[in-house]
Amino acid sequence: MGRYVIRRLLQMIPVFFGTTLLIFLMVNVMGDPIAGLCGERQCDPATAAQLRSEFGLDKPVWQQYLTYMGNVFTGDFGTAFNGQKVTELMATAFPITIRLTIVALLFEIVIGISLGVVTGLRRGRPIDTTVLILTLVVISIPTFVTGLLLQLLLGVKWGIIHPSVSSGAPVNELIIPGLVVASVSLAYVTRLTRTSIAENARADYVRTAVAKGLPRRRVIIRHLLRNSLIPVVTFIGTDVGALMGGAIVTERIFNIHGVGYQLYQGILRQNSQTVVGFVTILVLVFLAANLIVDLLYAVLDPRIRYA
């Protein structure tokens, strides 16, 4: 297991550098960020040259990338064009998005897996058909429609929640936004769990456990559920990074100043330092989540062992 972890960590190095280089190049293709600092009028050539020199934009792209990565390994993610450190923006945005992601994951795990197990064990029955139809409806509706509808009904019309989240973003105010973020993934987790449970319920090892006279609850939890969760864990693991970086629309709807909001502002203002800095952290989150998922395979299924 130890050698496997070391090998995976070594494999992450080229993936990390390749991904960050690609993002860095894509951000530089967006246009001249200095031009956006002067508003509608054109920047004075002397001022523009001074700003490019200050932010290192007068150097070749490959040299900018090497300088940036060297600073990253010292904990310096650069400075936004408004003079604020990117690390300060991260310190404000990431705790909010982490709380939002945890709320969304709880919805996915608790509701999604529970519904998947129930429908998988009752395949073809009315509850199975009902859940399949409901999940298909949820998948078909865009996230921004779900968010705006819940905000209008629960926040504006009925007054159950605040229409917008306060600056501190406490957990109780993130419940509905978390449900909106998790809605589509929750539906996929439900359907994936249902399919996996239904397939493994006919497996030989489950029939053997039943033939031995083991209690039904033990057969489901200890044997059927553990092996059926492998594809679900894979989906949830890859969904962690998507939830943290892909909640731009939901954060805009509920006025949440998290990672999605900062990425939106960075792209809108062509603030390359902010965009690259946040995406660099998200890449690390993706890589760490994938490694944890691989290690969980051996916990869920004893047949899987890493040399």
Which residues make up each language-model segment?
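Alpha-helical transmembrane segments of integral membrane proteins
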Residues: 2-4, 92-129, 143, 167-307
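N-terminal signal-anchor/signal peptide hydrophobic helix marking the start
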Residues: 6-15
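Membrane-interfacial helix-loop-helix junctions in multi-pass membrane proteins
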Residues: 52-62, 76-87, 163-171, 189, ...
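An internal, D/E-rich "acidic patch" concept
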Residues: 57-113
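A hydrophobic, multi-pass inner-membrane permease signature
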Residues: 138-146
